Curated annotation (Swiss-Prot):
Transmembrane segments: 87-111, 164-185
Gene3D superfamilies for the chain: 1.10.287.70, G protein-activated inward rectifier potassium channel 1
Localization, UniProt: Membrane
Bias type Basic and acidic residues, positions: 407-419
Protein name stated in the entry: G protein-activated inward rectifier potassium channel 4
Recorded topology in the membrane: Multi-pass membrane protein
Reaction(s) catalysed by this chain's protein: K(+)(in) = K(+)(out)
A Pfam match: IRK
Motif Selectivity filter, residue range(s) on this chain: 149-154
Source organism (scientific name): Sus scrofa
Topological domains annotated Extracellular: 112-135, 155-163
Non-traversing membrane segments, not crossing the membrane: 136-147, 148-154
Chain ranges on the Cytoplasmic side, renumbered to this chain: 1-86, 186-419
């Protein structure tokens, strides 16, 4: 009996039946309801609300919890300090200098205490280690003067104190190291090009429409500054959870979206707003996705724009994302570039605007089959003819051109118009 039940359980696992103990399923997989099918499992949405993987501002919604090996942050202390928020960075900056001043001030006071200088304050015949050092406060002030190299005034070290000379050398060297480390952290944090990404824009929506009789996923990018991004490049990834045929659940699986890295179109000359296009072909993850399936799928497209800041030469990165609800089928972007007298003008008021266009509702795979069979034109709605007097004038001009054409060209034109 035990062997039969074990065989039955193994058979259930092979055909994709849900295990009887839900606690053995990972937490990420329990958020979805598996549906048993023949040799595979499909994922149905659970009751858990949708969550963006990346905000429109570029911030990733990923929190690292239960980190056990926190000592790894100290192994790269410089990067840890640079990544801190400004209030914590300033707090560390102040505390490091204050602690070093207090530490060496205590040592100066300890030397004076051991030598007996504190018992001979005001004695003209006594030669102390540090003149006019009467207590811990004066030792602390002397430590600040030594480390910041602002110059000695009322308090000064004497040559009759070898231990003081050694301490002076040690504090001077360690003070230089602290200055280099802390000032370097502040300089790197100030010069970070994060704010440069604030002037790089992404359209609020992505669109899917026809380009050269092929379905394309498109979004628009722009740069508000007159100083350009050097060596700008764009890439995109599809974030979508999936389940393999063996039943393995892969949360937030990342798939590359080709935006021209095989042809060099991903290298941008970002002087004016550009429309980034992804051709939906056999290698695209949207190859079999129709308009109806777009409304049912759950995915997120993450776009990353990288380049060097022209003024500083530092690498800058801007990010954004598009949920499935932010992808508009059958839309195109409104043009923003106009030609003026002697220059081109960009109207950013219409940067995010789109308009509807004639686009088939079928997937790119079916569209390619129609094109091979010659049935594509009958599925594309023709644009409306102009009405009124303008339409009559156009028809009259067309008839006049038809009479002037040779017989062979006229027949070919009639055949093309009928198609």
């Amino acid at each position: 009996m035990a062997g039969d039940s074990r065989n039955a359980m193994n058979q259930d696992m092979e055909i994709g039946v849900t295990p009887r103990d839900p606690k053995k399923i990972p937490k990420q997989a329990r958020d979805y309801i598996p549906i048993a099918t023949d040799r595979t499992r499909l994922l149905a949405e659970g009751k858990k609300p949708r969550q963006r993987y990346m905000e429109k501002s570029g911030k990733c919604n990923v929190h690292h919890g239960n980190v056990q090996e926190t000592y790894r942050y100290l192994s790269d202390l410089f990067t840890t300090l640079v990544d801190l928020k400004w209030r914590f960075n300033l707090l560390v900056f102040t505390m490091v200098y204050t602690v070093t001043w207090l530490f060496f001030g205590f040592i100066w006071w300890l030397i004076a205490y051991i030598r007996g200088d504190l018992d001979h304050v005001g004695d003209q015949e006594w030669i102390p280690c540090v003149e006019n050092l009467s207590g811990f406060v004066s030792a602390f002030l002397f430590s600040i003067e030594t480390e910041t190299t602002i110059g000695y005034g009322f308090r000064v070290i004497t040559e009759k104190c070898p231990e003081g000379i050694v301490l002076l050398l040690v504090q001077a060297i360690l003070g230089s190291i602290v200055n280099a480390f802390m000032v370097g952290c502040m300089f790197v944090k100030i010069s970070q090009p994060k704010k440069r990404a604030e002037t790089l824009m992404f359209s609020n929506h992505a669109v899917i429409s026809l380009r050269d009789e092929k379905l394309c996923l498109m979004f628009r990018v722009g740069d508000l500054r007159n100083s350009h991004i050097v060596e700008a490049s764009i890439r995109a990834k599809l974030i979508k959870s999936r389940q393999t045929k063996e039943g393995e659940f892969i949360p937030l699986n990342q798939t590359d979206i080709n935006v021209g890295f095989d042809t060099g179109d991903d290298r941008l000359f970002l002087v004016s707003p550009l429309i980034i296009s992804h051709e939906i072909n056999e290698k695209s993850p949207f190859w079999e996705m129709s308009r109806a399936q777009l409304n049912q799928e759950e995915f997120e497209v993450v776009v990353i724009l990288e380049g060097m800041v022209e003024a500083t030469g530092m690498t800058c990165q801007a990010r954004s994302s598009y949920m499935d609800t932010e992808v508009l089928w059958g839309h195109r972007f409104t043009p923003v570039l106009t030609l003026e007298k002697g220059f081109y003008e960009v109207d950013y008021n219409t940067f995010h605007d789109t308009y509807e266009t004639n686009t088939p509702s079928c997937c790119a795979k079916e569209l390619a089959e129609m094109k091979r069979e010659g049935r594509l034109l009958q599925y594309l709605p023709s644009p409306p003819l102009p009405g009124g007097c303008a339409g009559a004038e156009l028809e009259a001009e067309a008839e006049q051109e038809g009479e002037d054409e040779p017989e062979g060209l006229r027949g070919s034109r009639e055949t093309r118009d009928s198609v």
